[in-house]
Amino acid sequence: QRIFGENYVQEGVRKIQYFRDAQPQAEFEWHFIGPLQSNKSRLVAEHFDWVQSIDRLKIARRLSEQRPSSMPALNVLIEVNIDDEETKSGVAPDDLLAIVKEVAVLPNLKLRGLMCIPSAQADEAQSRAAFAKMKSLFEFCRKEGFDFDTLSMGMSADFALAIDQGATMVRVGSAIFGARDYSNR
């Protein structure tokens, strides 16, 4: 395993620094996959290789401005609120093309594709429909001329279904590491 995703900025930065010090030759790739607040964007821009959760132009602009010029462009994915859930972050499907056009031209960022997290209450048919809709949005953006290569969707409980619907990246932390223990956070 060399690709790791983190939901929490400070926890992720601690792990990144630990592994860079402990194994400087190792080629780990670090993905930030959680919601990102403006006040933590600099840490993400300076430490992570990917951000899978771009949900606002403001965050994309901050990451672009804060990415050190000595580092490669930050790989980013636009998070889509595919089920239109009020409690979830993400761009509405109808607003997707507008933000894609803006983010694609920002310096220091490389827009690689899209990410979604379907409703936790969705049954298999609903998840399949959400993943199929995401694949359709992904292909639409490609037809509009964007060089997307990454469709991140599916987690431990539904990754096989996501792959079946076209995911190129899945997030399977709990399937590998077990359920997260929040008692000592």
Where are these regions (language model features)?
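Conserved alpha/beta-domain cores
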Residues: 1-157, 165
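Expand to "…catalyze enediolate/carbanion chemistry for C-C bond making/breaking, isomerization
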Residues: 161-164, 172, 176-183
